[in-house]
Amino acid sequence: MNKIKISLVIPAYNEEKYISSCLESVTENGGELYEIVVVDNASTDRTHEIAAGFSEVRVVTESGKGVTRARQRGVQESSGDIIAFIDADTRMPEYWVGEIIKDFEIDEKLVCLSGPYIYYDVSSLAKVSIWFYWSVLARIAYLFTSYMVVGGNFVVRREALEKIGGFDPNISFYGEDTDTARRLHKVGKVKFNQKLIMYTSARRLKGEGFFLTGYRYAINFLSEVFTGKPITSKYKDIR
């Protein structure tokens, strides 16, 4: 079997606070990656400068605001047959890339792979609640739909993503990951691997509140599943 080429795409908007830690984890633990592309999504801070300081990283610019537009630019600017997406406030575990390679090598029908978030900056009580969500509620949702994607922790086959027309630029934030998963499910297998953990900040949970954030994610997930479109069109940038 030919060696899998994995391109890593990281959308970034005003991420000067987090991007360095993210890229340090990527360059330390992503040795098997084919390339690393940071998409500066019209940042007004030092995001571009900081990312460009990593010799292993290529920085490109997308002036159209929105994570779907930034991800699509990353697809266009990358060349791997497998494209992985994480967020700029994440920290990559050392086994993450290896888990991707294993899953895609053993299953030719697999077109999309995702896994859970683990928040590295929340209380012990919050960690228990989040563990319950991933261990129970997320499993039920996946069994019901056969697809689930976490926007800052997923991987796709380029061929499959191109087949569905890429990301929907009309969806700015909420529901964009479920929209992508739902459409990819029509062309192949979408797997949610509980072992494919990505560490991330809890800035949105802290900025909007645990329950409000959970509600918005849940209601837009259900709306995408049953109507094919999200309910919430506006979102707040929390940095």
Where are these regions (language model features)?
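N-proximal low-complexity "stem/linker" segments adjacent to membrane-targeting elements
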Residues: 1-25
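Short, acidic, metal-binding catalytic loop of nucleotide-sugar glycosyltransferases
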Residues: 24-33
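A conserved acidic beta->alpha catalytic loop
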Residues: 25, 40-48, 90
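Glycine-rich, basic loop-to-helix element that forms the pyrophosphate-binding segment
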Residues: 62-78
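Short aromatic/hydrophobic "clamp" motif used to bind/position activated sugar donors
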Residues: 83
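Conserved donor NDP-sugar-binding/catalytic core segment of glycosyltransferases
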Residues: 95-125
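Short, flexible, basic/aromatic active-site loop/helix in glycosyltransferases
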Residues: 114-121, 127-151
